[in-house]
């Protein structure tokens, strides 16, 4: 959500395939409801549209198995094309259909959390994709990148260093940027408060973006996929 909103333009589309939660689609619904209740948000959305002359990026619901099919159907119906589509997929390969969807991606970015269960699951997921899809060259995938999410700043350097060594030994690739564990990532638009950080309609408030790790992550992801860093002021 933050990646798409931070780099929002008409080249982006968000596809919410995290069945059954569909958390991104639900967030868009909350955003729209809160805009209708908050005059400041209405003005902000209007000024944003006047400035960039583009609507908010679309969000559609889908199942992991049907994500690519639904994307093409959407583009055919709307007569639109997109340079970038962000898929919000569950971190599991539950069925053959999910594997086909994952194989159709260009890049996969896997968030990591320094928890043994989460790490074992994430690394196993990534290793399977590397060995069964990328290494065999029978898919569209160009690469998989891991990145640290919810990093504890209170001092667990030894733990992160140990996991980094494991990742290196497994031959997996880790982004240098990371996202700290901070409450600002929970700050959505609401009817009474200002200073939005997480939203499907607005980019993060610049005052809260400092030390969030988000600009660095966006820049590194853009470099990885061969995209010039977006103008986040648009």
Feature map (PLM): residue ranges:
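Conserved C-terminal guanine-recognition region of P-loop GTPase G domains, centered on the G4
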Residues: 125-135
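P-loop/Walker-type NTP enzyme "switch/lid" segment
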Residues: 13-84
């Amino acid at each position: 959500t933050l990646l798409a909103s931070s780099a929002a333009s008409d080249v982006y589309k968000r596809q919410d395939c995290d069945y059954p939660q569909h958390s991104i689609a639900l967030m868009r619904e909350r955003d729209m409801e809160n805009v209708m209740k908050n005059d400041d948000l209405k003005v902000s959305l209007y000024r944003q549209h006047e400035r960039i002359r583009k609507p908010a990026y679309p969000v559609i619901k889908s199942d992991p198995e049907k994500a690519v099919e639904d994307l093409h159907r959407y583009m055919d119906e709307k007569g639109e094309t997109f340079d970038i589509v962000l898929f919000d997929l569950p971190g599991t390969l539950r069925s053959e259909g999910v594997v086909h969807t994952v194989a159709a991606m260009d890049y996969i970015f896997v968030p990591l959390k320094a928890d043994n269960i989460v790490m074992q699951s994430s690394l196993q997921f990534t290793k399977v994709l590397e060995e069964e899809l990328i290494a065999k060259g029978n898919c569209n995938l160009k690469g998989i990148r891991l990145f640290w999410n919810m990093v504890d700043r209170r001092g667990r350097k030894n733990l992160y260093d140990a996991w980094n060594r494991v990742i290196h030994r497994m031959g997996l690739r880790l982004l240098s940027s990371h996202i700290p564990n901070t409450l600002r990532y929970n700050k959505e638009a609401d009817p009474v408060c200002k200073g939005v950080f997480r939203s499907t309609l607005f980019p993060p408030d610049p005052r809260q973006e400092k030390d969030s790790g988000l600009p660095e992550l966006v820049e590194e992801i853009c470099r990885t996929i061969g995209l010039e860093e977006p103008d986040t002021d648009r």
